[in-house]
Design a protein with these regions (language model features):
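Subset of Sec-pathway N-terminal targeting signals
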Residues: 1-25
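Composition-driven recognition of low-complexity segments enriched
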Residues: 22-231
Length: 231
């Protein structure tokens, strides 16, 4: 089992650590779990089911897993999926149908007239379909939705306004959704919810991320990572 500690995975961590939100030990474990092949596979499968209404084929799964393992952001993977011929065809093979589908799938609502026209105008003025897809995937509305979902999943509560603003600033500085999730799972609050016990912290992380309980060997592995990153 490999532990991912790429510079990209630590983007924004220094600022968070100065506010006493993270420890190196919980950060190392959270980074490894959320950047694991298992989580990448779960993410791609979930995206296929949600956006394309099917499980990924082996070639598609392998393609996107390779991208994620090479440091491509989850946002880029999601944008590629909604920019695919399959997704466009599933939404009527028209610009209006395609944009409407992305609003519904990514933002949970129909497009307002201004929003729809803005994206149609962008296409008419030469923007690529990928640029439009990426624009919706990385929109502030989408990012706020992801922050709220992560807080509900990992902390069991809604984020405060100042917390939303703080995480949005991380997005604006270049963080992606996986890095934000790492910050939340590595937080003192998540650790406290797990009883401030490293083994329980690992178990809770597995249950929230993978929807399963870790094996004893997995707990032992991540305990060794945790202990290696203690001050």
């Amino acid at each position: 089992m490999n532990v991912t500690k790429s510079p990209a995975a630590r983007l924004g961590v220094e600022q968070l650590e100065t506010r006493n939100l993270l420890s190196n030990a919980t950060l190392a474990v959270a980074t490894g779990i959320l950047n694991s092949p298992e989580n990448y596979s779960d993410f791609v499968t979930s995206e296929y089911r949600h956006l394309l209404g099917r499980n990924p084929d082996s070639s598609g799964l392998s393609h996107f897993l390779g991208m994620l393992e090479n440091g491509v952001s989850p946002e880029t993977v999601e944008a590629q999926i909604v920019n695919s011929n399959e997704y466009v065809f599933d939404h009527g093979n028209t610009e209006v149908g395609w944009i409407t589908g992305m609003y519904q799938d990514l933002l949970g609502r129909n497009p307002d007239a201004n929003g729809l026209n803005n994206w149609l105008n962008a296409l008419a003025n030469g923007s690529s379909t990928f640029a439009v897809a990426a624009g919706l995937v990385t929109s502030q509305e989408r990012e706020v939705s992801l922050i709220r979902s992560d807080y509900a999943l990992y902390l069991g509560r809604a984020p405060r306004t100042d917390e939303i603003v703080s995480w949005l600033s991380q997005f604006q500085a270049g963080a992606n959704r996986a890095q934000v999730a790492v910050g939340i799972v590595a937080s003192n609050e998540f650790f406290a919810l797990a009883g401030k016990d490293p083994s329980t912290f690992i178990t809770h992380a597995y249950q929230d991320v993978f929807l399963r309980t870790p094996s004893q060997s997995e707990v032992n592995f991540w305990l060794s990572v945790y202990n290696q990153n203690q001050p």
